[in-house]
A protein has these predicted regions:
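Catalytic phosphate/metal-binding cores of nucleic-acid and nucleotide-processing enzymes, i.e., regions
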Residues: 1-129
Length: 129
């Protein structure tokens, strides 16, 4: 059983990874352009300035949970099909389809025109520490 503190820490690690990855992706942005929301704050989990929104026009919600097993199993299946980048399309009744891709690949797709390495941050899972 996990504690509220450990669940919040796990969520915070993912938010920090996204923030740091975006800062590494767009070197023209300052620390003030990409910030992590305070726990419990309304709105997106990673706050982007107007300048950052011009470069990365997304509203970011971070969810770090163990309940994604079926999605990861589908992703592993797609990954085993060949050498290309895997993508999983998911859909529920009365909901629009979603595409699931690797986060680093997503960052690289948004790095078009930049010469920096988009991902300079490794995501550290507490179990690997």
């Amino acid at each position: 059983m996990t504690t509220i503190r450990s669940r919040k820490a796990k969520g915070r690690r993912l938010q920090d990874w996204v923030r740091d990855s975006l800062r590494g992706l767009f070197l023209t942005l300052t620390d003030d352009d990409v910030k992590v929301a305070i726990m419990g704050e309304r709105g997106t989990d990673v706050k982007l300035s107007k300048q950052a929104k011009k470069l990365f026009p997304y509203d970011i919600e971070c969810k770090n949970a163990e309940g994604w097993t079926k999605i990861y199993n589908a992703y592993d299946q797609a990954d085993g099909h060949g050498d290309d980048h895997p993508v999983v399309f998911i859909k529920m009744n009365r909901r629009k389809p979603l595409a699931i891709i690797d986060a680093k690949h997503f960052m690289k797709l948004n790095n078009v025109g930049f010469i920096t390495d988009p991902i300079k941050v490794e995501y550290l899972d507490e179990r690997k520490r």
